[in-house]
Regions:
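Non-cytosolic coordination micro-motifs
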Residues: 1-9, 41-148
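N-terminal leader/targeting segments
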Residues: 1-36, 145-148
Length: 148
């Protein structure tokens, strides 16, 4: 079954969890809803209930990626309210590694921690998480349109 996300049928999500995964508890694939089913985003993530520990994981992975891609633009974002929570109680912190000069020019790697409010966790069944995300240019432009 395809899980269409973001209130439309442009993209769908497939989520896998397995005890055999070594690094991440789950992997999420986002694909365009076309004949080719091109992967537009690939994520690895872990569930966490400790935002401070999540930020430590984020810092560690971000250092590895910055060392791996020293010539790419890195944008460190401050901790902020998560745009998906209208109450403003959920928070997120992200580091973006851009494969171009701007967010809409090329693909991106995002290293992210999200601390959902108790209300969001109960209502939507979402969990606090740490994620490493690779987005295509197409999907990144789509996400930018949701945030504006």
């Amino acid at each position: 079954k395809m899980n269409f996300a973001y209130g439309g049928d442009e993209f769908f999500i497939i989520f896998y969890q397995s005890p055999t995964f070594l690094t991440y508890e789950g992997v999420q694939i986002t694909s365009g809803n076309s004949e080719n089913y091109t992967i537009q985003s690939l994520e690895g993530g872990n569930f966490t209930n400790n935002f401070d520990e999540c930020k430590k994981m984020k810092t560690s992975v971000e250092k590895e990626l910055v060392d791996l891609f020293p010539n790419l633009k890195v944008v460190y974002q401050e901790e902020r309210k998560h745009w998906s929570d209208p109450s403003g109680l959920s928070k997120t912190i992200t580091t973006n590694i851009l494969f171009g000069k701007t967010y809409d020019e090329a693909g991106i790697i995002r290293i992210n921690c999200t601390d959902w409010s108790e209300k969001i966790e109960k209502e939507k069944g979402w969990n606090d998480n740490f994620r490493v995300i690779m987005n295509s240019k197409i999907f990144n432009i789509f996400l930018l349109s949701l945030e504006s």
